[in-house]
């Protein structure tokens, strides 16, 4: 049965349901707009709660996303888009250069009219660093999980390599005949003496003045 009083929808055989999208898992969720149009670079776009998210961030590093997209990859792109928006807002509070992306590169890392209050800057930038680390942990976890076309990726333990590099870079001191040297190698006498009144005072004993030393 057609809408609009039983008359067929405009355009002939195309119905209103087909224009709006199928309901259910394949349709758009509440607050989401799905665009089926492909860009020249072959990535899709979604608008979720006013934030435009695409799969181009993940497609750059993993070309298989163009063939096998997963639902959580949209979540990644949405999280990245929100993070970039927060970066722009935080950058506007401490710098007037106009583009926060310039600070990502060493040759363009100069700031203009930057606030001199280090505490204020740290308070503004710290949430961005925490969110970035948290997002990276989520990405690393999902990246390590197996997929139909990829085996499980195990995390590489690097602390043993770092320890070996430190031992290789270590050079013994020549003054000690090849042994290790430090500022605390000299013998330090921690004995304050049994005749000292400090020990008696700390132990609660009555303080007694030591007898004068007789010099022969």
UniProtKB/Swiss-Prot annotation:
Q: What is the name attached to this protein's record?
A: Dual specificity protein phosphatase VP2
Q: Keyword annotations for this protein? A: Early protein, Hydrolase, Protein phosphatase
Top-level lineage group: Viruses
Chemical reaction(s) catalysed: O-phospho-L-tyrosyl-[protein] + H2O = L-tyrosyl-[protein] + phosphate; O-phospho-L-seryl-[protein] + H2O = L-seryl-[protein] + phosphate; O-phospho-L-threonyl-[protein] + H2O = L-threonyl-[protein] + phosphate
Compositionally skewed regions (Acidic residues) per UniProt: 172-187
The UniProt induction remark is: VP1 and VP2 are detected 12 hours post infection, while VP3 only after 24 hours.
Q: What is the effect of changing residue 95 to S?
A: Complete loss of phosphatase activity. Reduced cytopathogenicity and marked inhibition of viral growth in cell culture
Q: Where is this region: Disordered?
A: 1-50, 165-187
Q: What is the lineage of its organism?
A: Viruses, Viruses incertae sedis, Anelloviridae, Gyrovirus, Gyrovirus chickenanemia
Q: Which residues cross the membrane?
A: none
| Pfam families linked | TT_ORF2-like (PF02957)
List where Low complexity composition bias occurs: 21-32
């Amino acid at each position: 049965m057609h809408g609009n009083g039983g008359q067929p929808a405009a355009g002939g055989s195309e119905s209103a349901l087909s224009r709006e999208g199928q309901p259910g898992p394949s349709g758009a969720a509440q607050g989401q707009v799905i665009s089926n149009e492909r860009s020249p670079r072959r990535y899709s776009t979604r608008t979720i709660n006013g934030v435009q998210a695409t799969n181009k961030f993940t497609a750059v590093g993993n070309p298989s996303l163009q063939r096998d997209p997963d639902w959580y990859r949209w979540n990644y792109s949405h999280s990245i888009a929100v993070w970039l928006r927060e970066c722009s807002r935080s950058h506007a509070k401490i710098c007037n250069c106009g583009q926060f992306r310039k600070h990502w590169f060493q040759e363009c890392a100069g700031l203009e009219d930057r606030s001199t209050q280090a505490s204020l800057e740290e308070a503004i930038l710290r949430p961005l660093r925490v969110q970035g680390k948290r997002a990276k942990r989520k990405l690393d976890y999902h990246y390590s999980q197996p997929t139909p076309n990829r085996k499980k990726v195990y995390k590489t333990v690097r602390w043993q390599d770092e320890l070996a590099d430190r031992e290789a870079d270590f050079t013994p001191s020549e003054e000690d005949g090849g042994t290790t040297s430090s500022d605390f190698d000299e013998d330090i006498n921690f004995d304050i003496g049994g005749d000292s009144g400090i020990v008696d005072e700390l132990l609660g004993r009555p303080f007694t003045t030591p007898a004068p030393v007789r010099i022969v």
